[in-house]
Amino acid sequence: QSGKVSFKTRMITGSIDGSDLYILDPSGATSHFIWRDPQHILAWTQPKDKRPGFYLFKDKTSEMEQITVGVMTENGHCTYLPGNEWILNDTYPDKQRIQHPYLFHVKSGKKVPLGDFLSPAQYAGEWRCDTHPRFSNDGSMVVVDSPYEDKGRQLHLIDISNCKKI
């Protein structure tokens, strides 16, 4: 399509000095990844002959498994909360231009919505405002970036201390 930019990404790990390179995901579709621990990376991708989704990769191996099937169904800005029991994620704007940050409880598969944030039409393309949810050091608060009324981009603080009780 005219005007559309296309790119492919592969996930490669290596030592801090650039040695010991390993192509962990050669699909060309790797996006939004986070280390869960020193051996595992969670990433949105579409491995060959598989459906798109969040996959957990074991570094330096071909081991991977799709997680969050049927719950975390869209690419987003994922991160593990302290303790790795919860994943914090968001969505891109839906048809109504609403973005949805949420928590996902890994063991139970429960999804906890954290709010609905309007992304006005002028915040599109390179000028978009992704929520990019991030947590406080103790994991009790989340901050998201989102336009608010006519005030432009704002940071919104969400208390999640009660959300994490299963």
Model region roles, listed by residue range:
Residues 6, 12-30, 57-74, 105-128, ...:
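Multi-bladed beta-propeller domains
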Residues 38-68:
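N-terminal leader/targeting helix
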Residues 2-12, 49-56, 96-103, 150-158:
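Structural motif
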Residues 51, 68-112:
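Loop/turn-rich, solvent-exposed surfaces of beta-rich toroidal or solenoidal domains
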Residues 1, 21-44, 71-90, 120-138:
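Conserved beta-propeller blade repeats
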Residues 22, 44, 52-54, 98, ...:
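Generic domain-boundary/flexible-linker signal
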Residues 127-166:
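Blade-level signature of beta-propeller repeat domains, shared across WD40, Kelch, NHL, RCC1
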Residues 37, 45-46, 58, 71, ...:
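Active-site proximal loops enriched in glycine and acidic residues that flank catalytic Cys/His/Asp
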